[in-house]
Structures are given as C-alpha cells and as structure tokens.
C-alpha cells in the first residue's frame, strides 16, 4: 500500500510523475479546479465582507471521492499543483474539499516535470502560501462581480449571450480604438526615389535611396515636385561623397516568456495563441520520448520571468562550448532585470535539458510539437550565446546637388545567429554586400532612376500577437489570462479574425460603446493595470484582498444602477444573405449557435427553416465547377468540399487555389508556405507565398 499521495492537476502529469517515484507513492489528478463560485448565483456576499461561497464543481464529486479514499490511507499527502497563483488556489481548494485540515499535508511545486525536479521538490515541502491564494481569490471575485453584474445589463439592453469582463472589456476597447484610428486615417501622398547604380568591378548594381539636397533631408509630396527633382538630376555625374565605416553588434535575445512565446509562435509558425498554449502544455506535462519514456521537455509555460536556474545555465554553457566552441559563449552582458510585472520565482520557458536536441527527438513528437519545441530550444540556446558582430558601411553619393545613400554590412562573427533568427529579423530586407571596398575614386554610373508614389498607411490592425504585446506593455492581465481573454472575445463574436488580423464586429462596437459610456473605469487601461498591481501587492502580502474588492465595488454598483435606468435598448440587425428560404422565399439571415454560424429564415416562428452556413472560399470545384466551401469534421478538423455535396464528392484537406497545375492540369492547394499540386505523384511546387487562412 502506498504511504504517500501526490495530487496533481492533470492525468497527463500523473503518467509522467508516476515513473519518477517508487511504489510508496500514489499519484492522482484533480482534473483542474474542484471548487468554484456557483453558476446560478453571484456567490459573493457583497452586502457583507465579500466572502466567496464556493461549491463543488458539477462532475467533480466522483473524483473527490476517489481522492478522499486514497487520502485516508496515506501517511502524508503532497499537493503538487502548478507553480503559480492558480495552482496555489487549487491546492487550497483541495485541502478544504478533501477535509485535510489537521492532517499531514504539504505543498510542493516544481518548474519542470523531470525526475530531478520532482524528487527535489519532495525534499522541500512547505505550507500553502495564502498570499498567493488570496491574490487568486481577489482576481476571481473581481472578475465574477464585473461579469455577473454587467452581463445581465447587456442581455437586457442588447441581446442575450453577451458578456463583459474586467480584462476582456479593456482588450475589446483597445481593438476598437485601433479600428477608430484606421477609419479616421487620412492618407497623405509622398514620393521616394531610388537610383540603381553600377559600381565598377561589381556584377550587380546597388540601389541607393534619395536622402536630400546638400546637407538637408527632403520630402517629396507630389508628382510635380518629383518631376522637378528628376529634371535636375538627369545627366549629372554620380560620385562618392562620403564613406562612413563602423561596427554594430546584435545582442542575443532573451529566453521566452509566455507573451513572447505567443508572439513569436504566431509570427514564425502561424500558430493562434490558443494553439501555442495547448501544444506548450503537452510539452510541459510530458511526451513519450523514444528510449527515455514520458518526460516533460519544457519548463512551466505561464511565466513573465526571463530568469534561468543555475543548473540550466551551467548545462547550456557546457552544451554551447562543446557544440559551437568557447567563443560562442555569452559574456553575460545585457542581462535583463526583472520587470515590475513578474510574478513569484518563475523561470523563463526553456527546454528542461538543452542536450535534448530537437532533431534527435523529432520522431517522438507530432509536427506541431516539434516545431514549437524547436523554437523554444533555439531561442534558449541563442539566449546563452555571444552577440553577433557586423562591420557596417554607410555610403553617401552625390548626383548633382542631390545626395543618395545606401548601407552595407558584413558579418564578422555570427554569435547567437548561428542558432536562431527571430521571425521579424528574418523578414528584414537584406543589405547589399560589395565584393570590393568602395573608395572616393570608385567609378559609378547611374543606370536608372526609379520614382515611386506612396501614400501613408493607417496603423495596422491588431493581430493576436500584437494584441498580447500591447496588453503586456500596458500591464493588463498576466501570462495565464492572455489566451483566454482573446478566446473569449472571439467566441462572443465581438471580433473576427481574417488572415491573422482582428476586426471589430457590429456587436463588438455596440458592447464597447456601452462599456465606455456606462463603465468608463472598467475599460480604462490605466485603472486595469493598477488593479493588476494591487493583485501583485496581495500576492506579496502587502494588501488585504478584501480591501481591494471593498474599494472597487461601490462605484461599480452606482454605475450599474445608473445604466439600468438611463441606457436605451439597442437593436442589432441580423446579417442578410443572398440565400433564399426554399419554404417562404425570404432572404436567409446569419445566426449564431453553440457550434458557430448557421442560416435561418427571418420569418421565425412562422417559418422555422434553417441550414448550415457554408463559407465559400472563392474557388470553383475542380470536378463540377460549383463553389468550394470550408467545412469541418465532427471533431472540428477543417476540410474543403463542393457545395453540391453529396451530388459532387470533391473533398480536399488542403485549401484549393484558383490556378491549375501547369505540369499535370490538376488542382493546386496551399501546402505549408507554398502552393503545390494536390497530386503528390506530380510533385509540382510554386515559389508563390499564399495568403494564409487561420
């Protein structure tokens, strides 16, 4: 019989941890939270001391019964939930739900699920940290009060199914504000002028950009101005005016935090934030590695720290020295100090063992697991390496009275770039490299002048990655909240996502307008950031959590009372389509159900006709010529089929494109970041970069 009971959150961890501990240990899972506030009522004593009234979550009774049974047999119980505020709160709820007060119960935590980390945690058991628990309770109570009090108001004034939230409403406002900026933007004309210049001894011409006239930088805002410049330049000699040499170095990147991993995975791998977190959770909880068994291969994924343990630091130093040489080791310069937002004593996201090289375990991972692990491994490895060094040359050319310039760079030492290049850096325009050094006597000839008209561009739409970056910079939310916040406003259809960009819907605009008018404090980014700081203060034991809630609630109650009396009802019109109801002839409208969009007759309840909403992708069926539509399997996997199914049985897992294969005449699909023939035996691939759909 097992002497010790270890309780973790997920069954996946059970499998991993069990093999690390002997037969004296029983490892069981709580399957996440076991207690929460009730769904049917507020569950908070707002007229008293704001004490939450927790109940057992439906469906968790059987799990708790099994845990109680094992707990009675055990000499000692270890609560081994995640190493953050949420995990601390789950341990506290387990303590009470299992009635373990007064028994031999300890809290243990580990930042990685490896044999050493788990065994080491058992040597350092501790009590539950009530400051961390209270910080989580404060967040839960504040979020419940905002959601439970404001959401019914939205139901009454707009439509049922809407919700407001302390963080989600701020995120929505940020997206709406950007949309307003874009709509209000007035483009302004400007012109650029490039000169392709032949350099004696070089095979390819270089491109220099117009800088100015004499010592003054100039801006050209019309065709007339550009024509004047061109007339003054034509026929003039091109001479080297000035050559300025220098050196620059690029510092190694910091290892990933939750937000930087989400941003980089979005840019480099095209992963939505939710997918990044799902795959990272798998890598953290444990994957079956050939020859090693089940093991966690990355550290804890919810962190805003860039700290690295001494053990991992030493392991990285040894690996880099052996793999690349001592000159590639970091000198330790530029180490970032902790941000004011950093929680607890977490580490950065890194591989649990740098010697577990991605290519060597590729066969044990799914494609997505491998790509994300490789990204994390490369970033961490690079973060412990030396900076890269470049020799730079900036050249100014005179053509008559006008000055053109270009810059070149030559790699002196690749440093960390040997291991990793960030997605943004990979997209940067490559600078020209000259075989022979330029001198002021070099012979130059202007081959062509290339004027180009431009218009200033509005701010870019937010993407999931850029929204996470903004939320973090503003101090809104924490690592555990970024993904669910974005998922919520997408699920509520306040925003939509098209080719990565986030767009506000009509209903999103209405909800944001109501929140700004009636609850300006809730959607104020500075207020929300300050609230996060107060929650941090609770976690540090500096502020009582109930004081935070007590100071927040009265103003919210007054705002709700005022809105209930003064807000007028808003009507949201359904989007009308060109599809005709076969039963009554009306134009069908788009409705939303638990499984997404569907088409319905606006004549309800007199006419109850409905049909699935089929999203046309703008491509004709290769078999019958009718529209190809996006569909989903019962398990949610996307595929593409003919709108005339079952009469036409065309089906493709890859997204078809309009062009035909020039080699075999078959249809082409998007395959990774290329366009390729759907027939693998043909094997034709183009160099075109497709517009990716999410």
What are these regions (language model features)?
Residues 139-149, 167, 197-199, 248-260, ...:
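Core structural elements
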Residues 16-20, 66, 89-97, 117-121, ...:
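Alpha-helical scaffold elements adjacent to nucleotide-binding pockets in ATP/GTP-utilizing enzyme cores
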């Amino acid at each position: 019989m097992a002497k010790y009971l270890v309780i973790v959150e997920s069954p996946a961890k059970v499998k991993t941890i069990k093999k690390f501990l002997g037969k004296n240990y029983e490892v069981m899972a709580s399957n996440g939270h076991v207690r929460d506030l009730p769904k049917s009522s507020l569950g908070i004593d707002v007229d008293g001391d704001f004490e939450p009234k927790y109940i057992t979550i439906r469906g968790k009774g059987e799990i708790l019964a099994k845990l109680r049974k094992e707990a009675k047999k055990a000499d000692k119980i270890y609560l081994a939930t995640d190493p953050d505020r949420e995990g601390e709160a789950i341990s506290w709820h387990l303590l009470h739900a299992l009635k373990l007060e007064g028994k031999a119960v300890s809290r243990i935590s580990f930042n990685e699920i490896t044999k050493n980390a788990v065994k080491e945690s058992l040597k350092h058991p501790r009590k539950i940290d009530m400051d961390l628990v209270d910080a989580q309770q404060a967040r839960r109570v504040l979020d419940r009060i905002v959601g439970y009090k404001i959401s019914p108001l939205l139901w009454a004034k707009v439509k049922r199914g809407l919700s407001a939230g302390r963080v989600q409403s701020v995120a929505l406002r940020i997206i709406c504000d950007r949309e307003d900026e874009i709509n209000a933007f007035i483009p302004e004309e400007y012109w650029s002028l490039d000169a392709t210049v032949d350099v004696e001894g070089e095979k390819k011409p270089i491109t220099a950009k117009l800088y100015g006239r004499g010592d003054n930088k100039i801006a050209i805002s019309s065709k007339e101005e550009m024509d004047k410049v061109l007339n003054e330049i034509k026929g003039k000699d091109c001479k080297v005016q000035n050559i300025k040499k220098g050196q620059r170095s690029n510092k190694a990147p910091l290892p990933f935090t939750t937000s930087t991993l989400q941003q980089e995975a979005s840019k480099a791998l095209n992963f939505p934030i939710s997918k990044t977190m799902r795959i990272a959770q798998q890598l953290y909880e444990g994957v079956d590695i050939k020859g090693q068994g089940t093991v966690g291969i990355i550290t804890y994924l919810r962190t805003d720290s860039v700290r690295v343990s001494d053990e991992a630091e030493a392991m990285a130093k040894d690996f880099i020295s052996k793999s690349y040489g001592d000159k590639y080791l970091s000198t330790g310069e530029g180490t970032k100090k902790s941000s004011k937002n950093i929680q607890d004593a977490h580490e950065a996201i890194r591989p649990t063992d740098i010697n577990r090289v991605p290519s060597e375990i590729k066969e044990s991972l799914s494609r997505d697991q491998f790509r994300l692990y490789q990204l994390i491994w490369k970033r961490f490895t690079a973060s412990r390496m030396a900076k890269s060094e470049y020799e730079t040359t900036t050249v100014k050319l005179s053509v008559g009275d006008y000055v053109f310039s270009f810059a070149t760079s030559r790699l002196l030492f690749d440093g960390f770039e040997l291991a990793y290049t960030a997605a943004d850096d990979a997209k940067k325009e490559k600078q020209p490299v000259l075989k022979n050094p330029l001198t002021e006597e070099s012979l130059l000839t202007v081959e062509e002048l290339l004027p180009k008209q431009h218009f200033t561009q509005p701010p870019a739409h937010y993407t999931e990655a850029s929204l996470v970056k903004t939320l973090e910079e503003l101090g809104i939310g924490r690592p555990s909240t970024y993904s669910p916040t974005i998922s919520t406003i997408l699920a509520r259809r306040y925003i939509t996502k098209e080719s990565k960009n986030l767009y506000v819907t009509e209903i999103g605009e209405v909800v944001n307008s109501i929140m700004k008018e009636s609850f300006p404090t809730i959607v104020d980014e500075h207020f929300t950031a300050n609230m996060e700081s107060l929650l941090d203060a609770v976690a540090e034991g500096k502020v009582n959590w109930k004081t935070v809630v007590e100071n927040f609630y009265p103003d919210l109650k007054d705002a709700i009372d005022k809105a209930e009396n003064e807000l007028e009802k808003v009507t949201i019109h359904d989007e009308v389509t060109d599809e005709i109801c076969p039963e009554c002839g009306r134009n069908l409208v788009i409705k939303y159900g638990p499984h997404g969009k569907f088409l319905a007759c606006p004549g309800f309840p007199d006419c109850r006709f409905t049909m699935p909403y089929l999203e046309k992708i703008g491509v004709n069926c290769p078999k019958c010529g009718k529209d190809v539509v996006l569909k989903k399997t019962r398990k949610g996997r996307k595929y593409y089929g003919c709108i005339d199914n079952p009469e036409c049985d065309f089906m493709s897992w890859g997204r078809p494109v309009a062009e035909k294969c020039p080699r075999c005449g078959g249809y082409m699909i998007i395959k990774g970041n290329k366009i390729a023939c759907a027939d693998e035996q043909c094997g034709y691939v183009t160099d075109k970069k497709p517009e990716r759909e999410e």
